[in-house]
UniProtKB/Swiss-Prot annotation:
Reaction equations catalysed: (4R,5S)-dethiobiotin + (sulfur carrier)-SH + 2 reduced [2Fe-2S]-[ferredoxin] + 2 S-adenosyl-L-methionine = (sulfur carrier)-H + biotin + 2 5'-deoxyadenosine + 2 L-methionine + 2 oxidized [2Fe-2S]-[ferredoxin]
Protein name, entry field: Biotin synthase
Positions of the Radical SAM core domain: 46-274
Family: Belongs to the radical SAM superfamily. Biotin synthase family.
Obligatory cofactor(s): [4Fe-4S] cluster; [2Fe-2S] cluster
Subunit-structure text: Homodimer.
Pathway per the UniProt entry: Cofactor biosynthesis; biotin biosynthesis; biotin from 7,8-diaminononanoate: step 2/2
InterPro entries: Aldolase_TIM, BATS_dom, Biotin_synth/BioAB, Biotin_synthase, Elp3/MiaA/NifB-like_rSAM, rSAM
Amino acid sequence: MANSNNQLLKEIRYDWNREEILQILNMPLIDLMWEAQIVHRKFNKYDIQLASLFSVKTGGCEENCSYCSQSIYSASEIKSHPQFQVEEVLARAKVAKNEGADRFCMGWAWREIRDGKSFNAMLEMVSGVRDLGMEACVTAGMLTEEQASRLADAGLTAYNHNLDTSPEHYKNIITTRTYQDRLDTIKRVRNAGINVCCGGIIGLGETNGDRASLLEVLSNMNPHPESVPINSLVAIEGTGLEDTQEIDSIEMIRMIATARILMPESKIRLSAGREKLTKEAQILCFQCGANSIFYGDELLTTSNPSFQSDRKLLKEVGVSFNKDFETCEKTLSSL
């Protein structure tokens, strides 16, 4: 590896190039995990953020993302529903908090946020979640500067807008929104003073070079995204990628470890596809840099490990909950 341990720990960089990243990504696995854990221990406390994700409005999205069952171009049989009422969403947030989550993420299957009644309700939901003492995150497509400002005023903690894949592979996945559209949205979020949640998906038919290119874009953002979700494709029947072969868990571990080295202080979130990972694979992801998970039975339209199974897993690796499951603390000194 071109960088020694001292170089890795010396400073946070925003000038990684694709060749450097590819070299890290392709390191012998044991060496890669070792390097990632050194960085992780240097820059982060040993805790795992528990985030709960709820689909506020499902289905009918105008985008043609080939992995998504919520697209109007998808033949998937999903249960679409209009936007939930504010009270219903806040009730879900209370349940998530009582189960141990400290961030409540709300998703809308929209191409973009549009002003009006639905947006006003979104603002109420954000304020209500913050009043519960939780972080609030929204994912709802593109937005304007004014909308970002209003979300910031409502107390929004973070806005999620993933890049999905590399600039080079992107056109093979979606054509109704450009890569630059995504980058512009992220810039508006950042300019409004809202934390950025931005990551991608592996298993979309991309190469290792594409993965390095995606990480190059993310790691050259200054500052780095506060949260970086790393998803693996959940192939859903009726979508354009329904026949895509499932990736090996080692590929997820490599992606998590490399992201940690490149973005030492970001929350690296082990996201969609986690249900397919064994307990041991998840623990390796935690060991080499993942310090956030989605916590709850469902992620928008895909399944997720249950509260009960996650509690058991986190307890086994050293996470203890208080009696009301309202807070959690992770002690992984043994890893």
